[in-house]
């Protein structure tokens, strides 16, 4: 976009966020800084991005008619999916019928809404290296896939994120409960799953890849620690060989070029020595990229905002060893944070509290961030800051 309007005026540049969690909140803030009129939608009220948007809507984004009605009402210049649980076929239809601009493209949103579309594209169409895998619909197919792939392996619903419904199978005793959890823990309820073999990797990274008007740019690789498929810590830069980094960039460019459009992609990769395997890709900012709030001059959210608006990204500057640590809450209630001051007493630390309206079970409610002389020091400082904050859940 060569021109940007003024919010809440006839000239406004309107962006509709489909999904209003903590990542969408940071995108909304960056768009606000550029004078964009932001509309946030999600399935529940008072979601984090709604708190910083010009207005918001509560809808079931898997409901095709509700999604069409919202887009017709708001007439956005850009639709920016921030989660997977969206009726993406509607976006494809509106893109074809009306020229609706979906970020990065409606096809990319549809392919990445579940693990099957993107895995088949990566492995079967593009020939990228991946773990061995099978897709299954029934418990019998699941058990046959586990037997064929062997233990250890991982089972995940094809439509889920942040570890929901995901289990690691290490013994025969894990097989039955893992299937049960996969059928109850995913975003879209019971259904199709992927069974993946284990890769004996040294570490895993997220390579934030930005497609923009000037070409494709890469952020420094981000290392991360996962537990039960969910992000716990991330750090940047992750040390890796020049050969492995070149291969990671090659794989990331291949998958993002095929998906097309403009915006930031989070490409997840496994690395062992100089070998690299494709794991997953999200066509939007990535939770492990929260570290870029302190590790880069332009965070992943600022990069996404610039890219989707067609603005230049002449350089991506990394600020040195940095780390993030997720702040977790368990139970039921409204989060209340104690000892935030203690977490901020160490120089070069920061805290982001997401503003999630409630917790039901297990939820990430904030993140601590740190810069230091080394990655190990930054990780330790971020962990200590997270430990210092007590999360209390009130009725």
Curated annotation (Swiss-Prot):
Catalysed reactions, as listed in the record: N(1)-(5-phospho-beta-D-ribosyl)glycinamide + formate + ATP = N(2)-formyl-N(1)-(5-phospho-beta-D-ribosyl)glycinamide + ADP + phosphate + H(+)
Keyword match Nucleotide-binding: yes
GO term, biological process aspect, one: 'de novo' IMP biosynthetic process
Record-listed E.C. numbers: 6.3.1.21
EC category: ligase
Residues bound to ATP: 115, 156, 161-166, 196-199, 204
Membrane-spanning segments: none
Any one GO CC term of the record: cytosol
Pathway: Purine metabolism; IMP biosynthesis via de novo pathway; N(2)-formyl-N(1)-(5-phospho-D-ribosyl)glycinamide from N(1)-(5-phospho-D-ribosyl)glycinamide (formate route): step 1/1
Protein purpose: Involved in the de novo purine biosynthesis. Catalyzes the transfer of formate to 5-phospho-ribosyl-glycinamide (GAR), producing 5-phospho-ribosyl-N-formylglycinamide (FGAR). Formate is provided by PurU via hydrolysis of 10-formyl-tetrahydrofolate.
Protein name: Formate-dependent phosphoribosylglycinamide formyltransferase
Organism whose genome encodes this protein: Stenotrophomonas maltophilia (strain R551-3)
Lineage: Bacteria, Pseudomonadati, Pseudomonadota, Gammaproteobacteria, Lysobacterales
